[in-house]
């Protein structure tokens, strides 16, 4: 029997051949040979799987899922079949450089982190931090995520910050290192979330169990972003507003009605802003998200 490898990099793909062609070469170049490389295909209807088997069968293992399970459940199902001591969940639109695996693993060992991510910068403008994690994720009291180097949509230049190793509240799902023991302890992602906020939810649950999460400042990866859902997608807005509420209600300690009143007010203002811009689909996405959450309240 083959021994369990120390690390496995797992890329979840859905109709992303264009991203695989662009970004997979950097993963192949900068990932050590003793690290397993997997692409878990989420029921793609393009020729991603055929292309991988034709061009990279000797290095990349392909796991085909029968349908698009979304980011959260897709990874849950994929990792049931992949053995490793540490998983690296890597978006298909991420470009890696240097000793990105080994350096991050060393930081995890040094600080005792169960979950970590490197600094995430923009692929098209690598001087600037990227929305999905930047230099470490945090959450404010009203359930709005922010990052070191990123507030809402405003991202700082990486050179303007002290990019040291630091403990954070959540790690970027674009390049997400997690110990297998922690993954199993938390039972993976919440598949009901489908996509968005799943890494925040998992990190929060693990922190409630006593685990620590960090950002490794010694490595930067470059993320394109919007690879599956564009920023102005009503479905993306629905998932973001719905999942933010669900994650807060599930993990936050305290009196939930008071929190819900605040979020109803703040999200209502966001919906009115969409309405003032003529973005009717985005406006309805906020209302639909709240309706889906209210149906789950006790």
Regions found by a protein language model. Give the residues of each.
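A short, conserved alpha-helix in the catalytic core of glycosyltransferases
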Residues: 163, 169-220
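Active-site-adjacent helix/loop segment of glycosyltransferases
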Residues: 10, 209-298
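A conserved acidic beta->alpha catalytic loop
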Residues: 26, 41-50, 67
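Glycine-rich, basic loop-to-helix element that forms the pyrophosphate-binding segment
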Residues: 64-82, 92
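Short, acidic, metal-binding catalytic loop of nucleotide-sugar glycosyltransferases
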Residues: 25-34
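Short aromatic/hydrophobic "clamp" motif used to bind/position activated sugar donors
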Residues: 87
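Conserved donor NDP-sugar-binding/catalytic core segment of glycosyltransferases
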Residues: 95-133, 137-144
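A recurrent flexible, glycine/aromatic-enriched loop bordering the glycosyltransferase active site
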Residues: 141-147, 152-181, 200-202, 229-231
